[in-house]
């Protein structure tokens, strides 16, 4: 994608992003879906289809570090399809050297493994067995990534999502590298 100043547009409280020719938006006054050391994730929508997506704004102090910026772009450009990974749509930046960078991905809904353990498995006799069983899909996703030469940099229970249909997805590659 060739950056230009029309890739990111602010209209009131809404931020509009052009990613691979498609426009997405989120309202920056809405509470975020989550936040971590590298960024904050907001609920967004496609302007064309109204499909709900996740939009991660990389924290400015990291977005302005060239090596981290390149890794964020790499993570967003990993257009893989695997049932146990979150599908990336792409990224958007104001300019290639500094300033905001956004990563857009398909929205995954459910609860994290952290939440699942604390809510449903605490004090159960079979808790360890159930946790281990939930890790098989994660290992399958990691094997897929490793076969492509990609290393996930932030594996933890908070980055493992159990969808409502019980599919398990590994999220937030932690600014992966190859």
Briefly describe each language-model feature range.
Residues 30-36, 41:
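Protein kinase glycine-rich loop
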Residues 56-60:
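Conserved beta3-strand ATP-binding lysine motif
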Residues 87-101:
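Short beta-strand micro-motifs within the conserved protein kinase catalytic domain, predominantly
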Residues 98-112:
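Conserved short submotifs of the Hanks-type protein kinase catalytic core
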Residues 113-125:
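AlphaC helix of the protein kinase catalytic domain
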Residues 134-135:
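Activation segment signature within eukaryotic-like protein kinase domains
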Residues 146-162:
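Catalytic-loop of the protein kinase fold
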């Amino acid at each position: 994608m060739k950056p230009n100043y029309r890739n990111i547009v602010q209209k009131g409280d809404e931020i509009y992003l052009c990613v691979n020719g498609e426009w997405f938006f989120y309202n920056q006054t809405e509470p975020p879906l989550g936040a971590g050391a590298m960024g904050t994730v907001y609920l967004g929508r496609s302007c064309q289809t109204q499909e709900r997506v996740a939009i991660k704004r990389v924290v400015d102090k990291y977005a302005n570090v060239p090596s981290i910026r390149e890794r964020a772009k790499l993570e967003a450009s990993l257009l893989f399809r695997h049932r146990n990974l979150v599908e990336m749509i792409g990224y958007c930046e104001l300019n290639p050297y500094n300033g905001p960078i956004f990563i857009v991905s398909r929205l995954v809904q459910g609860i994290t493994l952290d939440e699942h353990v604390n809510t449903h498995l605490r004090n159960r006799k079979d808790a360890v067995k159930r946790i281990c069983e939930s890790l098989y899909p994660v290992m399958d996703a990691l094997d897929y990534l490793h076969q492509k030469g990609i290393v996930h940099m932030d594996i933890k229970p908070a980055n493992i999502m159990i969808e409502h249909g019980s599919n398990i997805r590994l999220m937030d590659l932690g600014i992966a590298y190859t």
